[in-house]
Regions:
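FAD-binding core/adjacent interface of flavoenzyme oxidoreductases
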Residues: 1-5, 58-143, 219-220, 230-232, ...
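Mid-to-C-terminal Rossmann-like scaffold of FAD/NAD(P)H-dependent oxidoreductases
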Residues: 2-3, 272-368
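Beta1-alpha1 glycine-rich phosphate/pyrophosphate-binding loop at the start
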Residues: 2-71, 157-179
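Glycine-rich Rossmann-fold phosphate-binding loop(s) that bind the pyrophosphate
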Residues: 8-11, 124, 145-150
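FAD-site-proximal beta/loop scaffold in flavoenzymes
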Residues: 118-139, 209, 213-293, 298
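Rossmann-like dinucleotide-binding cores of NAD(P)H-dependent redox enzymes
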Residues: 141, 150-206, 312-317
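A short, polar/charged loop-to-alpha-helix boundary motif
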Residues: 368-384
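Cysteine/selenocysteine-centered motifs that mediate thiol-based redox chemistry or coordinate metal-sulfur cofactors
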Residues: 384-392
Length: 392
């Protein structure tokens, strides 16, 4: 392997180049990053940074790049791939040659096809965070479209700023597909107990605009006045570069268990990659922090000739009011949930079990340093009587 180019200066790209150098690769390495920042972690954007805490989200020490002779090109976008000549065209006009190209272009907020939606707030970047934080003035009214993880995290942060928050969710319960009815009901109750006006079974039809921007939303249940509107209805993978270069795209860039596209010189990792998981025997596109880190490191290992494959279970975490949790696994839609511990006190473990009694996923809420034990349980058969909150 000669020169490596990584397109995308997010967490996955940062961890890939960190690993390449950490494992002794000495060839030229360049990261092309569209944002005007060094790679940073996004989870604090909807948590500590939105609460006004002084948290540094930077993924690598600023001195690291020079110390490790990795070229970081910020505020530069890759606009075209010439796979035949193995080069990337940048919006600065240059062409960069690669021997191995890693696409780590991440995802972008989904913008609904509704009047006015392009004028709403979204949350993906540091600049977005600044805009959302500026909107969190005590007494202001914030309408949040979508009760997914980001929408609910922003709702929690906004209530801490004493903002009047209305959350509008199309489904009957927030995050029911992930948590199941009982636990999503628990989360909904928690938000309501903190003054969030969480409305479910409601569809948003328009973001209403005044002369200075959004002034509310029109919904299937009437109009809601607001000073700010945030749309948080998920993300779409940034696949344009790959698609235009003729690579297979199907809900992300399609890659095998070693993150390779059909072109042996091009890999894809992180939020943009729809990668075959050998353990779960299915293709997965995972939009989580842990996945970006693991795939970044793993693709470096693959490029260095190691026998590394995508075989780990998805993991993620959230913090909303008193509900702080880690979640591991991939339960099926019909798996049943068993809880152990104090659900009302937000200190419990939830286990997902399939029809055969095998653990398919688990979540530790307010109980820490147990997620590795839960991960080890996934895929094993456990008698319900043997499931505990792991605290004794
Ligand atoms: P990204 O972080 O999206 O980075 C991709 C980068 O590539 C971007 O900077 C983009 O500008 C750049 N790029 C795209 N196209 C080009 C191009 N053509 N040329 C150059 N650069 C390009 N996960 C959790 O597990 N727990 C959490 O609590 C959590 N909280 C989150 C909160 C927020 C607000 C957000 C937005 C995400 C959160 N996530 C969380 C998800 C997690 O942050 C992502 O999974 C992770 O950032 C993915 O990293 P990535 O490097 O694959 O992509």
């Amino acid at each position: 392997m000669d020169d490596v180019v990584v397109v995308g200066g997010g967490l996955a790209g940062a961890r890939a180049v960190e690993r390449l150098r950490g494992e002794g690769f000495r060839g030229p390495v360049t990261v092309v990053a569209a944002e005007p920042h060094e790679p940073y972690e996004r989870p604090p954007l909807s948590k500590d940074l939105l609460l006004g805490k002084d948290t540094d989200p930077t993924a690598l020490d600023p001195a690291w790049w020079e110390q490790h002779d990795v070229t970081l090109r910020v505020a530069v976008r890759a606009i075209q791939l010439d796979r035949g000549a193995r080069r990337v065209h940048l919006d600065s006009g240059e062409w960069l040659h690669y021997d191995q190209l890693v696409l780590a272009t991440g995802a972008e907020p989904r913008v609904p096809d509704l009047p006015g939606a392009d004028r709403a707030l979204y949350l993906r970047t540091l600049e977005d965070k600044d805009r959302v934080l500026a909107a969190l003035r005590p007494g202001d009214r914030l309408a949040i479209v979508g009760a997914g993880w980001i929408g609910l995290e922003v709702a929690a942060a906004a209530r801490t700023h004493e903002v009047e928050v209305t959350v509008l969710e199309m489904a009957d319960l927030p995050l029911e597909k992930v948590l199941g009815a009982e636990l999503s009901g628990h989360l909904a109750a928690l938000h309501r107990s903190h003054g969030v006006d969480l409305r479910t079974g409601v569809s948003v039809q328009e973001v209403l605009l005044g002369p200075d921007g959004p002034v509310g939303v029109r919904t299937s249940q009437g109009t809601i006045d607001a000073d700010h509107v945030l749309v948080a209805i998920g993300a779409v993978p940034a696949v344009d570069l790959a698609r235009e270069a003729g690579l297979e795209v199907d809900d992300g860039i399609v890659v095998d268990e070693r993150f390779r596209t059909s072109d042996e010189h091009v890999s894809a990792i992180g939020d943009v990659a729809n990668a075959w998981n050998v353990r779960l025997q299915q293709r997965l596109r995972v939009e989580h922090w842990d996945n970006a880190i693991r795939q970044g490191r793993a693709v470096a290992d693959v490029l260095l000739g190691r026998d590394t494959v995508h075989d780990w279970l998805p993991y993620f975490f959230t913090d909303q009011f008193e509900f702080s949790m880690e979640y591991v696994g991939r339960p099926g839609p019909h798996d049943r949930v068993e809880t152990r511990g104090d659900v009302e006190g937000h200190e419990f473990i939830a286990y997902w079990l399939d029809a055969a009694g095998e653990v398919t996923g688990a979540m530790n809420v307010g109980i820490w340093d147990v997620n590795d034990r839960l991960r080890a349980l996934v895929g094993t058969r456990v008698e319900p009587a043997d499931l505990t909150d792991l605290r004794q």
